[in-house]
Amino acid sequence: MTLSPYLQEVAKRRTFAIISHPDAGKTTITEKVLLFGQAIQTAGTVKGRGSNQHAKSDWMEMEKQRGISITTSVMQFPYHDCLVNLLDTPGHEDFSEDTYRTLTAVDCCLMVIDAAKGVEDRTRKLMEVTRLRDTPILTFMNKLDRDIRDPMELLDEVENELKIGCAPITWPIGCGKLFKGVYHLYKDETYLYQSGKGHTIQEVRIVKGLNNPDLDAAVGEDLAQQLRDELELVKGASNEFDKELFLAGEITPVFFGTALGNFGVDHMLDGLVEWAPAPMPRQTDTRTVEASEDKFTGFVFKIQANMDPKHRDRVAFMRVVSGKYEKGMKLRQVRTAKDVVISDALTFMAGDRSHVEEAYPGDILGLHNHGTIQIGDTFTQGEMMKFTGIPNFAPELFRRIRLKDPLKQKQLLKGLVQLSEEGAVQVFRPISNNDLIVGAVGVLQFDVVVSRLKSEYNVEAVYESVNVATARWVECADAKKFEEFKRKNESQLALDGGDNLAYIATSMVNLRLAQERYPDVQFHQTREH
């Protein structure tokens, strides 16, 4: 049976994100993946000292200064017979909310681990999020051009700490200065490493067969024997790759390599297009939507302001779940129940924006947004339903924002509300005074807000500490009891950027007392968009 042209397009799509701890090499891997996808001609190393060639996926002013990818961008490139959408997630610890939401828009993740360090804190956190949806995970053990920990130990650590079985696909031969290449367990081939070829795709020399004398000649007898001994152990102690278990999120295929040396990345990409799922079904509040359906549906998982310094615009990122987008089609924005014609959607090659004529499930569209689109918005061809599972987290850190020039209050409020709609921070406006309290999941976000208020809204502001420990969104089925609660706690209530009522607690004890005193009021730690 031949698939219809539409289903062929759906089957070609692979949409994934990279998760890692800061500095495990995520941005470098992104570069090399794009190099293999022929999306960029030469890979820019991330912190080129004094060079102007910034990594292709880092592009806001502050990222340029700090050499980190703060905003999630989207890159599409062809690889073999597939079209791959790579969603870049911020690697720095603070940008978790944006990252969490990005993970709701992918069908698969690549976990990058620094093989000298093993499993780190941020990786654990991100893996917890992928667990919520049993997202399939591929693993890349990076930095083999440095001295690494024992590979068996690394696999054990992943299995014990992240509760996922490891199935090694390739195995390293030496490391650091002695790194010679990797052996492919399923093809019975050894790929030999040459250093210093990181910016180009190199012709790799292949030795077929583990017992081939050419292998001893190429890597030296000692390393060749060590490889054979290790593989005996590996075959006895580790999982075999099983595609069904991989798709269920129970085992992860593991690849070894060095992104900086541009070696091993293509083995991982081969695995990705061969095993990772085509676009998956998604849950709405009324039913499950399959990618094969012909009616268009999609949801917004991120909003980013000023992607283009030349245009003061904001772009909403929408994941296509089903149906085909065509230029000029009429879509219903479910939250407002309004129909909109979308004729200028964007597709992305990081930093370069081009208008798109059509898009399929798994693809990410950029919609121009003048403040009417919110995170979590569902678009359909008329059906009234909402995709679920796009979270907002209660912030853990709070600061008061104060203006240097009190006359700019209006611009400040506008800037903060726009930044909060984008999910960069959350804004709380206390009901009883004129303060503006900003909540974030990590400290770096406050610096980002102050620097963006200055560069994008021309507002000079500073932040100072405020007596707030945590916030909870509140609601109550009993209107009378809710009114009483609101009257008695007015000094601790605030509205967030979307005008939802929140309780601002000065300490965890204060929050507990309020919860005990008002058992009918619900205090929520997350809010669905």
From Swiss-Prot:
Keywords assigned: Cytoplasm, GTP-binding, Nucleotide-binding, Protein biosynthesis
Chief localisation class: cytoplasm
Residue stretches making up the tr-type G domain: 11-280
Positions bound to GTP: 20-27, 88-92, 142-145
SUPFAM superfamilies membership: EF-G C-terminal domain-like (SSF54980), P-loop containing nucleoside triphosphate hydrolases (SSF52540), Translation proteins (SSF50447)
Cell compartment(s), UniProt: Cytoplasm
InterPro entries cross-referenced by the UniProt entry: EF-G-like_DII (IPR053905), EFG_III/V (IPR035647), G_TR_CS (IPR031157), P-loop_NTPase (IPR027417), PrfC (IPR004548), RF3_C (IPR032090), RF3_dom_3_sf (IPR038467), RF3_GTP-bd (IPR041732)
The keyword Cytoplasm belongs to this UniProt entry's keyword annotation: yes
Entry's Gene Ontology BP terms: regulation of translational termination
Gene Ontology CC terms, in alphabetical order: cytosol
PROSITE patterns with a match to the protein in the record: G_TR_1, G_TR_2
Family: Belongs to the TRAFAC class translation factor GTPase superfamily. Classic translation factor GTPase family. PrfC subfamily.
PANTHER family per UniProt: PEPTIDE CHAIN RELEASE FACTOR RF3
Protein name as it appears in the record: Peptide chain release factor 3
Lineage: Bacteria, Pseudomonadati, Pseudomonadota, Gammaproteobacteria, Enterobacterales
Gene giving rise to this polypeptide: prfC
